Amino acid sequence: MPELPEVEVSRMGITPHLLNQTIQSLIFRTPKLRWVIPSELKKLQGQVIRHIGRRAKYLIIETDVGSAIVHLGMSGSLRVLDADFPAGKHDHVDLKLSNGKVLRYNDPRRFGAWLYAAPGEDHDVLGNIGPEPLTDAFDGQYMFEKAQGKRVAVKQFIMDNKIVVGVGNIYASESLFRSRILPTRATMSLSAEEWQRLVSHIKQTLQTAIEQGGTTLKDFSQADGKPGYFAQELQVYGKAGESCPECGEAIQELKIGQRNTFYCSYCQC
């Protein structure tokens, strides 16, 4: 599943091709992805794209009459192509531009979404969510205070979008390993110093992943079709049974909150 770095990489990749361009047409080849595609999106035809933003794992394509809100789901990707490039089997949405390009949304599993928000309004999917992890609002003190009285496993806690957005499964496992914190520990058991260390590693891991173009394990590709290269930096995720890069012990795997979790029982405590 594309996580925050992959969505941010997509935003950075498409922005030079979309910004200040006019949307000539929107083409939908399916009526429904995860949710029904709203008819209000057709209002964006003929409008100039003013800004391409991101909140959590949602891309926001802004015009004067409203915004398209895009979620990549489990297997979605966005590519910028020549407008006459033939559409493939899983190419469900085209946003044709005045510069002769098309923003094409591909999603084999159809778990993604294209939604509409009126000017100045936030869509319900963006309500009641936590701060962005790469901002100053996300720090060790904030997490220490949020953690008080919480018995849930720390990995599950940092993946809760109501606490902080965008820390997905890959980056949660990697950040906990780099922080030397066991993913099963009760959230409230972490000290203020441990929270500061974990927050620092979350920020570093996400930023490095963005700089590496994200992580391609199966479906994700950048806007130019290239894979992300952070997979080469993974230390524990997907490596059950392999040797820990720090101590040589076998990397362990278990499920926390129905998500596969990877860790070193010797290095993490």
From Swiss-Prot:
Q: Spell out the SUPFAM superfamilies in the cross-references.
A: Glucocorticoid receptor-like (DNA-binding domain), N-terminal domain of MutM-like DNA repair proteins, S13-like H2TH domain
Q: Which family does it belong to?
A: Belongs to the FPG family.
Q: Which Pfam families match?
A: Fapy_DNA_glyco, H2TH, zf-FPG_IleRS
Q: What is this protein called?
A: Formamidopyrimidine-DNA glycosylase
- The EC number of this protein is 3.2.2.23, 4.2.99.18
In this chain, DNA is annotated as bound at H90, R109, K150
GO MF entries: 8-oxo-7,8-dihydroguanine DNA N-glycosylase activity; class I DNA-(apurinic or apyrimidinic site) endonuclease activity; damaged DNA binding; zinc ion binding
What residues sit in the active site? Answer: P2, E3, K57, R259
Question: Could you tell me which species this protein originates from?
Answer: Vibrio vulnificus (strain YJ016)
Q: Where are the zinc fingers (FPG-type)?
A: 235-269
Q: What quaternary arrangement does the UniProt entry report?
A: Monomer.
Catalyzed chemical reaction(s): Hydrolysis of DNA containing ring-opened 7-methylguanine residues, releasing 2,6-diamino-4-hydroxy-5-(N-methyl)formamidopyrimidine; 2'-deoxyribonucleotide-(2'-deoxyribose 5'-phosphate)-2'-deoxyribonucleotide-DNA = a 3'-end 2'-deoxyribonucleotide-(2,3-dehydro-2,3-deoxyribose 5'-phosphate)-DNA + a 5'-end 5'-phospho-2'-deoxyribonucleoside-DNA + H(+)
Picking any one GO biological process from the record gives: base-excision repair
Cofactor(s) listed in the protein's UniProt record = Zn(2+)
What keywords are assigned to this protein? DNA damage, DNA repair, DNA-binding, Glycosidase, Hydrolase, Lyase, Metal-binding, Multifunctional enzyme, Zinc, Zinc-finger
Say which domain of life the source belongs to. Bacteria
Role noted for this protein: Involved in base excision repair of DNA damaged by oxidation or by mutagenic agents. Acts as a DNA glycosylase that recognizes and removes damaged bases. Has a preference for oxidized purines, such as 7,8-dihydro-8-oxoguanine (8-oxoG). Has AP (apurinic/apyrimidinic) lyase activity and introduces nicks in the DNA strand. Cleaves the DNA backbone by beta-delta elimination to generate a single-strand break at the site of the removed base with both 3'- and 5'-phosphates.
Q: What does the cofactor section's free text say about binding? A: Binds 1 zinc ion per subunit.
Stored Gene3D superfamilies = 1.10.8.50, MutM-like, N-terminal
